[in-house]
């Protein structure tokens, strides 16, 4: 898989929108923890999860999920958002923060094949 011995590749698939429930928050906390522990993490945003990568989030009285996603990217996570899912929700590449790339199901399939573990939120 191309990673040093002892390092797992973990793909985290997030389908939940931010702020409606805590699944997306839990997914990002999981991903950040895995990164801090030295694992290789790939985050795929799908369905309403694509809103996690949208610029300009500034929620009141709850943790800012976008800041967590940015921390994951800073720690080395590769992040992709489903292009068709984004388009269906009125989002284009310009709507996403730096470090989030639009992708396809082919990209997700390749990540799953390359991963030691896949977790779906």
Swiss-Prot record:
InterPro entries: DsrEFH-like, Sulphur_relay_DsrE/F-like
Source taxon at top rank: Archaea
GO terms for cellular component: cytosol
Residue ranges of the TM segments: none
Family from the record: To M.jannaschii MJ0989.
Name of the protein described by the UniProt record: Uncharacterized protein MK0008
Organism: Methanopyrus kandleri (strain AV19 / DSM 6324 / JCM 9639 / NBRC 100938)
């Amino acid at each position: 898989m191309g990673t040093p011995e002892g390092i797992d590749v973990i793909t985290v698939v997030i389908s939940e929108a931010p702020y409606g429930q805590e699944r997306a928050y839990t997914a990002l906390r999981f991903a950040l923890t895995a990164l801090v522990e030295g694992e290789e993490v790939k985050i795929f945003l799908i369905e309403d999860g694509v809103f996690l990568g949208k610029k300009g989030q500034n929620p009141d009285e709850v943790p800012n999920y976008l800041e967590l996603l940015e921390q994951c990217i800073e720690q080395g996570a590769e992040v992709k958002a489903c292009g068709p899912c984004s388009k269906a929700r009125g989002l284009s590449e310009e709507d996403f923060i730096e470090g989030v790339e639009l992708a396809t199901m082919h990209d997700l399939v390749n990540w799953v094949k390359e991963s030691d573990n896949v977790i779906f939120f």
